[in-house]
Amino acid sequence: MRITFDPAKRQKTVAERGLDFADAAMVFAGVTLEVEDARRNYGETRIICYGLLKGRLVVIGYTPRGASRHIFSMRKANDREKERIAPLLEI
């Protein structure tokens, strides 16, 4: 599956969080847990994906667009997420 993203949002995330949307493929290639973000109607399906990037649990927000995953967010998991999600991923 192809990965797309807004280049400006990617640069902002690299600068502010030290994470690069271009590395999302490494997360998707491993064991992940994905849930649909149904907190509100965004006008499109949004998926929250938990997975490992270089040994660290990260959270990626994306929307499926045809054969692509369009990344809109990427961040390090917080302590509560690590506690809750890590056992489900068996990490």
Segments and roles (model prediction):
Residues 1-91:
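Ribonuclease/tRNase effector modules and their secretory precursors
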